[in-house]
A protein has these predicted regions:
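C-terminal accessory helical subdomains adjacent to catalytic cores in phosphodiester-
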Residues: 2, 19-37, 51-156
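Conserved helicase/translocase motor-coupling segment
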Residues: 41-49
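Short beta->alpha linker loops
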Residues: 12-13, 104
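Short N-terminal binding/cap micro-motifs at the start of the first secondary-structure element
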Residues: 14-18
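Short hydrophobic beta-strand that contains or immediately precedes a catalytic carboxylate
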Residues: 4-10
């Protein structure tokens, strides 16, 4: 059976969010093989790994399906969009593009989640923010003035 879509995301949190969102919206389980974790936008466009993604996209397109790339805009929405469109043209692949948090601003999935959180859960977010701020204050001699951060939250 031919797949109708493939969604390319950066990481585990993105995959989990997209999967749960689609299941909620369409009231059906989503084949996890249709959501592909690339381990970051650099891996998608890297000459060492891009062939895997190009082949997957071309196969989906040949089967009449749609490819969707959903990545973080990070620190520069326009730059990230431009680089991904240039890669798309260079590799002759077809995909739709959406950049978190809202397809127009800089940011990432976590920024979107912070905006849509249920107000009842805001104390959890406040606690988490305090924890992140406390990590920045920790000084470790071998870190050479590099603050501690959480792996899932990139510094923008």
């Amino acid at each position: 059976m031919k797949e109708l879509f493939k969604i390319f995301v950066e990481g585990d949190a993105d995959k989990r969010f997209i999967s749960q969102l689609l299941e909620f919206l369409f009231k059906t389980s989503i084949d996890q093989g249709n959501i592909i974790k690339t381990s970051g936008w650099n891996c998608l466009v890297s000459p060492k790994t891009e062939e895997v993604y190009v082949n997957q996209m071309n196969r989906t397109s040949a089967d009449g399906g749609v490819n969707l790339v959903i990545f973080d805009a990070d620190a520069d929405f326009e730059d990230r969009k431009k680089k991904l469109i240039l890669w798309k043209e260079r590799c002759h692949v077809d995909f739709e593009l959406f950049l978190f948090p809202n397809n127009k601003d800089t940011g990432e999935l976590e920024d979107l989640l912070e905006k849509i959180i249920n107000p009842e859960n805001q104390p959890v977010m406040d606690c988490w923010t305090s924890y992140e701020e406390a990590l920045k204050q920790v000084v470790l001699p071998w870190r050479e003035d590099t603050p501690l951060t959480l792996p899932a939250k990139k510094k923008i």
